[in-house]
């Protein structure tokens, strides 16, 4: 089809500096078509870097959820030296709801370590990604995670493109 040049989708997760044990951030999907707030637990957070994102069924959550695939981390090793696997994006309100997974929602302005409307945010994200996959079945989705002190932000995550599987 007229599906060229390849329309790989890029998602950016721009992390803020950790406050206590919480890392907040912004998830910018497809050049800002969708933006969501994120929350991660610092001690389990995966390294900054570039990952392929897939949508698979999660037996634990009993729903289709994004999963980060292919650990192409740089700039920072996992805190405990353990390679993180099974990292998903899912709903939740505080870091107690995550063992390294990325929670999405809207930051509670009264309590920055808390997400509101998380289920709604997850549904929006999943719907956007599923529609994209339907429209571009042969393309990949990449997520680049950046940190303020770890790596410069690029408009186009060049590492992602270099390391295509």
Located regions from the model:
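Cell wall/extracellular polymer interaction/catalysis modules
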Residues: 4-141, 147-152, 158
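Transmembrane helix recognition focused on a "late"/terminal membrane span
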Residues: 154-155, 163
């Amino acid at each position: 089809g007229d599906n060229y040049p390849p329309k790989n989708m890029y998602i950016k997760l721009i992390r803020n500096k950790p406050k206590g044990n919480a890392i907040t951030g912004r998830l910018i999907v497809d050049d800002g078509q969708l933006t969501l707030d994120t929350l991660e637990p610092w001690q389990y957070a995966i390294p900054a870097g570039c990952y392929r994102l897939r949508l698979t069924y999660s037996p634990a959550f009993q729903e289709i959820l994004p999963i980060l695939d292919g650990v192409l981390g740089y700039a920072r090793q996992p805190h405990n030296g353990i390679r993180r696997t099974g990292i998903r994006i899912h709903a939740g309100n505080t870091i107690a709801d995550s063992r390294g997974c990325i929670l999405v929602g809207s930051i509670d302005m009264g309590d920055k370590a808390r997400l509101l409307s998380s289920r709604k945010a997850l549904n929006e994200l999943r719907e956007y990604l599923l529609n994209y996959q339907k429209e571009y079945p042969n393309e990949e989705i990449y997520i680049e995670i950046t940190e303020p002190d770890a790596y410069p932000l690029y408009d186009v995550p060049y590492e992602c493109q270099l390391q295509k599987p």
